[in-house]
């Protein structure tokens, strides 16, 4: 099962990481001073990402 994990880093900031069902970390967040802020970021991703497009910025445009 995919999951978000909330944790505190060495600087005391709240962060999250997103893990795949095989345990691999797929991405992680920036640091947040408040736990409520990191939880809001997770909810925003859940709400807004289902229709997100993929933009390949590695291709050259002329």
From Swiss-Prot:
Q: Which InterPro entries match?
A: DUF1508 (IPR010879), UPF0339_domain (IPR051141), YegP-like_sf (IPR036913)
Q: Which cysteines are joined by disulfide bonds?
A: none
Q: Which residues form the signal peptide?
A: none
Asked whether the UniProt record includes Aminoacyl-tRNA synthetase among its keywords, one would answer: no
Q: Which family does it belong to?
A: Belongs to the UPF0339 family.
Which keywords does this Swiss-Prot/TrEMBL entry list? Answer: Plasmid
Protein name (record): UPF0339 protein Atu5359
